[in-house]
Amino acid sequence: MGVPKFYRWISERYPCLSEVVKEHQIPEFDNLYLDMNGIIHQCSHPNDDDVHFRISDDKIFTDIFHYLEVLFRIIKPRKVFFMAVDGVAPRAKMNQQRGRRFRSAKEAEDKIKKAIEKGETLPTEARFDSNCITPGTEFMARLHEHLKYFVNMKISTDKSWQGVTIYFSGHETPGEGEHKIMEFIRSEKAKPDHDPNTRHCLYGLDADLIMLGLTSHEAHFSLLREEVRFGGKKTQRVCAPEETTFHLLHLSLMREYIDYEFSALKEKITFKYDIEKIIDDWILMGFLVGNDFIPHLPHLHINHDALPLLYGTYIAILPELGGYINESGHLNLPRFERYLVKLSDFDREHFSEVFVDLKWFESKVGNKYLNEAAGAAAEEAKNCKEKRKPKGQENSLSWAALDKSEGEGVASRDNFEDETEDDDLFETEFRQYKRTYYMTKMGVDVVSDEFLANQAACYVQAIQWILHYYYHGVQSWSWYYPYHYAPFLSDIRSISTLKIHFELGKPFKPFEQLLAVLPSASKNLLPTCYQHLMTSEDSPIIEYYPPDFKTDLNGKQQEWEAVVLIPFIDETRLLEAMETCNHSLKKEERKRNQHSECLMCWYDRDTEFTYSSPWPEKFPAIERCCTRYKMISLDAWRVDINKNKITRVDQKALYFCGFPTLKHIKHKFFLKKSGVQVFQQSSRGENLMLEISVNAEPDELRIENIASAVLGKAVFVNWPHLEEARVVAVSDGETKFYIEEPPGTQKVYLGKTAPPSKVIQLTDKEQSNWTKEIQGISEQYLRRKGIIINETSAVVYAQLLTGRKYQISQNGEVRLEKQWSKQILPFVYQTIVKDIRAFDSRFSNIKTLDDLFPPRTMVFMLGTPYYGCTGEVQDSGDLITEGRIRVVFSIPCEPNLDALIQNQHKYSIKYNPGYVLAGRLGVSGYLVSRFTGSIFIGRGSRRNPHGDHKANVGLNLKFNKKNEEVPGYTKKVGNEWMYSSAAEQLLAEYIERAPELFSYIAKNSQEDVFYEDDIWPGENENGAEKVQEIITWLKGHPVSTLSRSSCDLHILDAAIVEKIEEEVEKCKQRKSNKKVRVTVKPHLMYRPLEQQHGVIPDRDAEFRLFDRVVNVRESFSVPVGLRGTVIGIKGASREADVLFEVLFDEEFPGGLTIRCSPGRGYRLPTSALVNLSHGSRCETGNQKLTAIVKPQPSVSHCSAAPSGHLGGLNHSPQSPFLPTQVPTKGDDEFCNIWQSLQGAGKTQHLQPTVQEKGAVLPQEISQVTEGHKSGFTDHSVRHQQRKHDSQRKFKEEYKSPKAECQSQKLSSKQTSGGSARCSIKLLKRNESPGTSEAQKVVTSYPNAVHKPPSGIENFLASLNLSKENEAQLPHHGEPPDEADLSPQSFAMKGTRMLKEILKIDSPDTRDSKNDMKKSDNEATVSSRRDERGVSAHPKPTCHMNKPHGTNEFQNVASVDSVCWPGQMPPVSTPVTELSRICSLVGMPQPDFSFLRTTQTMTVCQVKLSNGLLVHGPQCHSESEAKERAALFALQQLGSLGVSFPLPPPIFTNYPPAVPPGAVPPVFTQPTANIMPSSSHLFGSVSWRPPVPVAGNAFHYPSYPGTMPLAGGVPGGVHSQFIPLQVTKKRVANRKNFENKEAQSSQATPLQTNKPGSSEATKMTPQESPPASSSSSQAAQPVSSHVETASQGHVGSQPRSAPSSSKRKSRKLAVNFSVSKPSE
């Protein structure tokens, strides 16, 4: 157990000691040592409080294996991996083990009794007894065999284990695990060839490992341990190492902090100041507060500042000692005695506080203790006075002589006598106080001098034994400290002449230790023949196994710190009692009862044999085992006690990356109570603060000089935990220098080479951001690291090192080059370190392509086709010279998730705002908010509180400060909390259990803390019992065990994950896995190599939910090449820390359960994945039916969003998507021309569903998202540059270039006009071949309004585009060029207006019965383009100027609609319309409740947030009642004027004279998916109310009656994110098509819907369109046209229905790929 509270105290006093382990920046270690018992306990009984918990042995073994794999993977030792399990301990340790096991057995028994008393039914299987983790038990024997199997398996199958020597010291090897490790380290150091720069990492949970590590005096030594959380709610331990946060404690920093702690001695001592000797004495002082071998000295507690007292005393006394106390493990007794004498002043000081309190108490009430003490010591006091009398008289006479008068002399004498009497009384009381301690604690009758001398000798002997144990190993197996308590410091005297000698003896055998440490409750862990010795009354040692025992806190606070008062085992009696039973041992038991050697294993490729499995049913045999081993004798590592070698640390040596030091930056240090927050709370004690000294010359701090010194260079940031970074910009708050280099370039400029740079002046906003950055960095350094950075003159912007990647030069050479993050982070200049010599051991033997891609090597394709496929390199000798590699790729079958993506809203958990829950539960929203969080109830009443203890009776479903939620119950959307039906049920149950609690808090909402007696004031009410009942209910409820997740985590709900698993299983049944052989350029392949860990395989890939991915990391928990689906994205403040939750296609060992089947989930970083879906998007140019989710940082840095941002799309709480950005002005004309060409002659199908609310998010969106939301980069232009760079890179390959792909996207299919056919290629205007995408984004074309149209423009304007040749419009991701109105667009607009007036080429024709039906709503073509590259959808030319009812914020139909005689579209249901109206006018969703009448009829009640309450008629079913009630509500709304339908504009082609200004969004944050999607027509409603956009027409949508009628498509068919694109499976006859279109358009009647009308007929199945089709208009923004407020509804002339017999039927199909030109 080590030293209680020591780890927390030391971490808070020295704040920079520890850092959270980040796998991508872990330092390199040569040796990794594991103290295994912590892992065994963690994996076998993670939650001792749960009496229902059961676990099987195979699960324990599997978890232990996985834990070892993860630790090995994190640290990646280069030379030695040492696993040490606790063997038989020295007798000194057994006493502590015995007490701990007795306590744990009793606690387990008590918990089981309480559970049974509560009526709980416990499992029939036996619970896991943690006491079985003791050498000699059957469990440990089985574990030993399985660990040997595991070592052999990993060495034989895992490349990363094959270059390392493995040591396995099991439970059969005597000694504690950590001390066996230290024996090995000492023996290695004693070798003549020992490398002093060996880098050690020791894993373990014990706090005394800090001391053990320091005894090695090694310069590069770190401790790895799980994060320890102090304070707050006790949470269940997590078994999975992936879920665990690991901390790395650096002893290199600990050494420097100790140096600072005792730096005052440098000026005081006369002998040499030696930090190694100071560290030895520091270790000795740590023993005085107690550890596993001796109790703490009385009243010396760490949490009562015992350690600062020890340090202060040491600093005061050391100058007088003439040398150090601890001489390499040998105690210098004379110096130690003088130190203890000085320290003993503490005893008197502590008692003086007690004495003063006792005297005061006696003066008030009389005190029996003082009277008895005075009486008992009267004789001793009298003798003491008599001895002092002559001296007292002499003093009195001398005082009298000095006084001028006799009276004064008498007064002085009286005062002196009083003081002497007080001193005598104090000493008497002090002796009596200590005497009472010894009599009561140690049970002695007479506290004699001999007793005290024996106490002192035993204690000093204990200190010396521990020093030997830490420095030299076990010096005596049989010695132990024979008391439960330590003596007073003032009684440890006369020790300088003690002769201390130890007999080595021999360790207990395993069964002897078991009988010595186990309680009778664990008797079954012993062989049967010994069990009666623990239970039988006739047993000669029965008194050593008391069923009940007492514990004594002895000044401690926690029960686990208490002294367990059980008798010490008499070794002789124990062995004699066992002797009579030994003959009954079985053969297997005899084998267990012996010691064995340590195992040394290594890989040998020439050795091959079959290693049989210790459990064939669970673990397979190792068919090709390549492990060799050697037995290491028990005393092989024993080093002579006089040859303990101390490593001398070379202060001028190279800096070893990952082993921090404070020496690189000048600073001052001092102790101060600064409240540094290392753990969850601010520290209460002193912190050793560091203050950076800025002594630079003014010229050095000029921004020009700083820029020339660091710009483009590699520096180290984040002092003292240095990380390498590349500087890309510097700024002093007014000026900014930055590197100007081609996109994608990350060059480090060495020497005096100056990078190409530019300088700009910061705007006011940028200056403000600069100041905020400094404030944030300063606060972080001060609050977490205890570092004061002082005034900042410059901020450095840099990219952190992410790893190294093999780069291939043109001549075929291979180099390992550093890779830098794309994310740019700010660092203050005075904390960066430059020009240091750093040791870099990362060398590579790979120099050529042959080395990098030898035959039979596994690779992954990063080009298209076959993106992400696994391949095997073939013999490529004939192609290497040409720079190509021959590879055979496996092409597996991939599941089709498109339909699931479209219908995901059906399976998502629905969340409601708090007021909805409040309305349903009949309570206020305040109560919902309070009870789902935390509520504290104190004891007593507000007027008379009883203590400070407060109980939390909240449900703890949300955590604002920690930004955490409980999935399935709560969801945070923006700043609003949403709640599921499960949370509603839980609250309802709570209200039923404690209605008076809810009632009281509702009346006293202004209070923060409530009190028991105020809530339950009745005489018969016991508030404490009520609170305890509530707490017991809360702890027993399943919700208390649910895990929290960050609000930044975007996830798919469990129901969707289940559907994904079903699709994957369907795909497996097809078993299609073809192979292709291709030749590939080497830079398009990724080979999994350890040197490339941390490097993202494809930096252009963007990850979205539902994306298909493949693991490309070797020696990982997930098998390399295993495919999966992204089901969650966890954002982080740093790019490298982003994690993806992946559901893999197969179960694998070590897999997690993340809302999925057991063993199929895992969390991986971007560097471990290749995104298969990204490859598909690149290959086809088609956007998948989902929105981009760019990982969100927890804290964004300097957002690059424009100030005029209006917000974007909002989604439901479970929706993982980011808002789109606001459209920008001036990028519409190119789109309109293109869409008019695409859409002319195209029938507009179906009213777009609300699911398709403009959430068209092509892959390039995330680039802007990155800058706007997450702060990963500054400007979207840079992203466009990067995209263009990636296009240029792909052009070089044999695969389809991205640029070509883009041009294909923008090229139309062949069209025909009349009988003649024309091929048209549409080019971007003013585009030169060399123009980069970034330049296109920012270029504004000159205004060319007055140029006359050219012939080609007239030709385009008059073209009739064939419907058969209509082209799809894929969502290309590049934003169009911003342009003013051009001649082309004017020509097109004029032509369109003329055609509309003359009704030429109207697309509003109707196909035959099998054709798709036209939507009522003709949404307008976008006059804007989304900044992120959202492409508008095609629209017929003649409908370009129709009224607009759709924009990006509201996706509803326009007033203008088309209906066909005799065939009316189905009605959108009243419930859907009411939900839509509420959303669009900013009202919360309606609340529906049902009432049952006596006639078993159902009445629905609709309640709106504006107070409107509507009752529907009586109906036979709930669904009918709900619809009728919603219809009534809609009629009420119409009469009240709640909805605001506005008429369409008259002159839609002309912009307003004064464009309206930008209006901010009504809701600043996304709201929730309040209502479930309608099951027949629509998905979720649009969550953002309509927002007017500058320069655009704007009006609210209509309610039923003015709403156009919807097409009858089955619910859930459409994607709620991207409209489906409809293409033809076969080409229809094109003859006379234009003439038919003209006839049908003239014959089509138009109807204007009146408000309140809802007449329509339902479509028959034959009339309904195919379920897979969709409108292509769903995401069109509003055109910028005038809408006059006084304008009425404009109707169109009726048209006759076309004859379906005149045209051929067409079949439409959904096609998600780019149309081929041949079509």
From Swiss-Prot:
User: Which terms under GO biological process does the entry name?
Assistant: histone mRNA catabolic process; meiotic cell cycle; RNA processing; telomere maintenance
Question: GO molecular-function annotation terms?
Answer: 5'-3' RNA exonuclease activity; G-quadruplex DNA binding; G-quadruplex RNA binding
Residue ranges with Basic and acidic residues bias: 1268-1298, 1397-1430
What is its subcellular localisation?
Cytoplasm
| Modification Phosphoserine occurs at | S1382
Ranges of Low complexity compositional bias?
1661-1680
Record keywords: Cytoplasm, DNA-binding, Exonuclease, Hydrolase, Nuclease, Phosphoprotein, RNA-binding
Q: Where are the transmembrane segments?
A: none
Q: Which InterPro entries match?
A: 5_3_exoribonuclease (IPR027073), 5_3_exoribonuclease_1 (IPR016494), SH3_12 (IPR041385), XRN1_D1 (IPR040992), XRN1_D1_sf (IPR047007), XRN1_D2_D3 (IPR041106), Xrn1_helical (IPR041412), Xrn1_N (IPR004859)
**Could you say which tissues express the protein in this record?**
Expressed in heart, brain (spinal cord, dorsal root and superior cervical ganglia, neurons of the cerebrum and brain stem), peripheral nerve fibers in the skin and intestine, spleen, lung, liver, skeletal muscle, kidney and testis.
Query: Where does this protein have compositionally biased stretches of type Polar residues?
Result: 1301-1314, 1638-1660, 1681-1690
Q: Phosphoprotein among the record's keywords?
A: yes
Per the UniProt record, which EC number(s) apply here? 3.1.13.-
Disordered: annotated segments: 1268-1317, 1397-1445, 1634-1719
Q: Main location per UniProt?
A: cytoplasm
Q: Cellular component terms, GO, for this chain's entry?
A: cytoplasm; P-body
Supply the Pfam families for this chain. SH3_12 (PF18129), XRN1_D1 (PF18332), XRN1_D2_D3 (PF18334), XRN_M (PF17846), XRN_N (PF03159)
Q: How would you summarize the oligomeric state and partners of this protein?
A: Found in a mRNP complex with UPF1, UPF2, UPF3B and XRN1. Associates with alpha and beta tubulins. Interacts with DIS3L2. Interacts with ZC3HAV1 in an RNA-dependent manner. Interacts with ZFP36L1. Interacts with TRIM71 (via NHL repeats) in an RNA-dependent manner. Interacts with YTHDC2 (via ANK repeats). Interacts with DHX34; the interaction is RNA-independent.
Which family, according to the similarity comment?
Answer: Belongs to the 5'-3' exonuclease family.
**Name assigned to this protein:** 5'-3' exoribonuclease 1
From the UniProt record, report the name of the gene that encodes this protein. Xrn1
